[in-house]
Amino acid sequence: MTTGSKAKRRLTILGSTGSIGQNTLDVIAQLGGRDAFEIAAITGHDNIDLLASQAKACGAALAVTANEDRYQALKDALAGTGIAAAAGRNALIEAASIPSDWVMAAIVGTAGLAPTLEAARRGADIALANKECLVSAGDLFVRAVAEGGGRLIPVDSEHSAIFQALEDDQQHAVERIILTASGGPFRTWSREQMANVTPATARAHPNWSMGFKISIGSASMFNKALEMIEAKHLFNVRPEQIEVVVHPQSVIHSMVGYTDGSVLAQLGCPDMRTAIGYALTYPSRTKLDVERLDFTKLARLDFEAPDEVRFPALRLARTAMERGGLQGAIMNAAEEIAFHAFVDGRIGFLEMADIAEAVMDQMIATGTAETMDAVFAADEEARRRAGVLVAQREKAA
């Protein structure tokens, strides 16, 4: 860990090859790179060329691929550099356990749960971009952060906005959390049109540059559904205090409403590097090379209520929060299976929500999220059931 004002901060990036990870390395480079930071470890999955290139560029001590079959390729790519290579699930957890001041948790999906939880237990400040930590194991994760003594700083643009708009010592005065949503590429489409959506069409986000999974999650509004559950755990609010408003321009990233009628909002151009930079330098702010918001060029800012008939994921999030227990983990796992089935052309776009809801209803009596074993068991069973439903629909088509 760092000591002294001039010591380099020690960082770990879990998920460096994804969209968030790449933007994180860009921010680190802007803020001084090797002169200001020591990179303890970076991790990726199948993109070995990019992972090795990143490790060399940032001077990481360790590079880890989650795919054990790619270990030799990574080792060969790093030969002669002095950078250690490792592979597999246990290697991810070991990378997360390396003492660091700050950990970017950007591994997508439930694969990020165990390593992020380990980093939290070790006392690092966690810049959280992985949704599943809070959606599937919110109480466990928040408790691990508290026990570890680190800080939890959200990186999602919406949660970062809320984090910034929350006034110190005014939690008691928070009346509502207002998450904004662009509405995605199908905001004005009918259900009939959405039934014929292809993965390529769903991938096109109108405002943000993001990865494939997140882009399709934005199109279905499942991302927003997960963010609702995250907000409940991050900001210790009741489900009924969480609102979603569609804001097509994505200029207002989210808002906090207070009991005196005031609403505080965080605005900016849609660029993930702003939220990443804030998380990296919190509680300070620093100069970043990102586009500045020009109010004179904003012709209008529009807002509308979300249509939960066309976008039922929002309703499912409320159901999961009301039921509690493992419903968040179940919803997330079932949606992941449905997502892959949609991408593979096995089911339609609208069927993703149908499958998630069906599995949630089937597993309504499943226990509580008291342990990671319980979370993983529910996740595994939800995936199995979702797979069965996908196969049934595919056969009936």
Swiss-Prot record:
Pfam families: DXP_redisom_C, DXP_reductoisom, DXPR_C. Keywords: Isoprene biosynthesis, Manganese, Metal-binding, NADP, Oxidoreductase. It catalyses: 2-C-methyl-D-erythritol 4-phosphate + NADP(+) = 1-deoxy-D-xylulose 5-phosphate + NADPH + H(+). InterPro entries: DXP_reductoisomerase, DXP_reductoisomerase_C, DXP_reductoisomerase_N, DXPR_C, DXPR_C_sf, NAD(P)-bd_dom_sf. GO terms for biological process: isopentenyl diphosphate biosynthetic process, methylerythritol 4-phosphate pathway involved in terpenoid biosynthetic process. 1-deoxy-D-xylulose 5-phosphate binds at K131, S157, E158, S182, H205, S218, N223, K224, E227. The keyword Manganese applies. Catalyzes the NADPH-dependent rearrangement and reduction of 1-deoxy-D-xylulose-5-phosphate (DXP) to 2-C-methyl-D-erythritol 4-phosphate (MEP). This is 1-deoxy-D-xylulose 5-phosphate reductoisomerase. It comes from Rhizobium rhizogenes (strain K84 / ATCC BAA-868) (Agrobacterium radiobacter).
